[in-house]
Swiss-Prot record:
Subcellular location: Cytoplasm
Regions that span the bilayer: none
Family: Belongs to the DnaA family.
Coiled coil region boundaries: none
Source organism of the structure: Shewanella oneidensis (strain ATCC 700550 / JCM 31522 / CIP 106686 / LMG 19005 / NCIMB 14063 / MR-1)
SUPFAM superfamilies: P-loop containing nucleoside triphosphate hydrolases (SSF52540), TrpR-like (SSF48295)
Region (Domain IV, binds dsDNA), start-end ranges: 341-460
Name of the protein in its database record: Chromosomal replication initiator protein DnaA
Length: 460
């Protein structure tokens, strides 16, 4: 009875939550009765804590509405419900190669000359990319949580998993971390990672060698397929056709698919609607540019791995000025470390200013309050004058608040200076705008998307 009640509760939650919230937090839950207690099993600690913190009141309220004093007690646990646990599958043959392929490597992922019956899968997962060395922050928290769940339960609730965001934000790191997690749990798993261009190259090579059946057999018999930068399938009709059928075959067999892109699935031009629709069948998660604290943590971790003692004030100095992506941060730190090694000088703020003077000058030139105002006004299709006006209609006030929040995040200007740039507003108005936008980014998918798009535009 209570399990049936949980199914009704799921229907209520699906109506009340966004599609992403429901897929991320509610869909993975499993329910089972234990005496007079309904136990909800979460796939990991992160999901358990989130559901218990955010949704337990809604769940309990629904149970009380339906059953009054007879409502079951509620308990949370981690794992799968006992009756749902399956026997371990029989291992399947696979071949690991010691040196992982990269996006730039050449050749094909499958051997067009081998017999059809001997489809050999080379696991090209990079062992250096692990969850343990992925620096987590608010910008990538959901992405990491989803990736962890996929590593623990491939082919489960988050299938396909679609990660999107700008260049250098850690999407590829998460792909390899998932692959390493799957292989750790099942060393014989057939896990294949590749850039989308490799899939296209393999298909072309298969056509040239009259080996299209081997191509199909190879890709449709993997346990997990991870494809980076799926947007490069744009306008490649034959590749899209083959991937469409591969996608369907893998999902029907409960084999895991993870895709990445630099944009939201529906915004990928040149890709068929039927594919874009399927990209959203599982879970779609944005990976955003890292916030200040995460940027500092990334720098400190990288310095530690390099055996360098990076002073806190230096890490904050770099992190406040370089905001676009992780790759840029790490590149800047590598330059600082190299200069310090060559010159023997200690790493101070003045030293960093000198070592990164061209990079810092370019960044400060690109991101100004005026540039932010113009970019936001153009994005929301309002007049530049509206940014400075006293108008309070939501169509104007909300973009103005977004621009203020971006100014605080992307420039080194103080709150009073930002207020002055927005028509002489008080610093408390700017602070309110920043807090309001931070709240809306948690609650509104549209605002979250808008903010991420503007960050990418201003940082590119």
């Amino acid at each position: 009875m209570a399990v049936s009640l949980w199914q009704q509760c799921i229907g209520r939650l699906q109506d009340e939550l966004s599609a992403q919230q429901f897929s991320m937090w509610i869909r993975p839950l499993q329910a089972e009765m234990d005496g007079d207690t309904l136990v909800l099993y979460a796939p990991n600690r992160f999901v358990l804590d989130w559901v218990r913190d955010k949704y337990i009141n809604i769940i309990n309220q629904f149970f009380t509405e339906q059953m009054g004093n007879d409502a079951p007690k509620l308990r949370f646990d981690i794992g799968s419900r006992p009756s749902a646990k399956k026997p371990e599958p029989a291992p399947v043959a696979a071949v690991r190669v010691p040196s992982p392929q990269t996006k730039a490597s050449v050749g094909t992922a499958f051997n067009t000359t081998e017999p059809v019956a001997n489809t050999n899968h080379r696991s090209n997962i990079n062992p250096t990319y692990q969850f343990d060395n992925f620096v987590e922050g608010k910008s990538n928290q959901l992405g990491k949580a989803a990736a962890l769940q996929v590593a623990e339960n491939p082919g489960g609730a988050y299938n396909p998993l679609f990660l999107y965001g700008g260049t250098g934000l850690g999407k590829t790191h998460l792909l390899h971390a998932v692959g390493n997690g799957i292989i750790k749990n099942n060393p014989n798993a057939k896990v294949v990672y590749m850039h989308s261009e490799r899939f296209v190259q393999d298909m072309v090579k298969a056509l040239q060698n009259n080996a299209i059946e081997e191509f199909k057999r190879y890709y449709r018999s993997v346990d997990a397929l991870f494809i980076d930068d799926i947007q490069f399938f744009a306008n490649k009709d034959r590749s899209q056709e083959e991937f469409f059928h591969t996608f369907n075959a893998l999902l029907e067999g409960n084999h895991q698919i993870i895709l990445t892109s630099d944009r939201y699935p529906k915004e990928i031009d040149g890709v068929e609607d039927r594919l874009k629709s399927r990209f959203g069948w599982g879970l779609t998660v944005a990976i955003e540019p890292p916030e200040l604290e995460t940027r500092v943590a990334i720098l400190m971790r990288k310095a530690q791995e390099s055996g360098i003692n990076l002073p806190d004030e230096v890490a904050f100095f770099i992190a406040k000025r370089l905001r676009s992506n992780v790759r840029e941060l790490e590149g800047a730190l590598n330059r600082v470390i190299a200069n310090a090694n060559f010159t023997g000088r200690p790493i101070t703020i003045d030293f960093v200013r000198e070592a990164l003077r061209d990079l810092l000058a370019l960044q400060e030139k690109l991101v100004t309050i005026d540039n932010i105002q113009k970019t936001v006004a153009e994005y929301y299709k309002i007049k530049m004058a509206d940014m400075l006006s006293k108008r309070r209609s939501r169509s104007v006030a909300r973009p103005r608040q977004v621009a203020m929040a971006l100014s605080k995040e992307l420039t080194n200007q103080s709150l009073p200076e930002i207020g002055d740039a927005f028509g002489g507003r008080d610093h408390t108005t700017v602070l309110h705008a920043c807090r309001k936008i931070a709240q809306l980014r948690e609650e509104s998918h549209d605002i979250k998307e808008d903010y991420a798009n503007l960050i990418r535009t201003l940082s590119s």
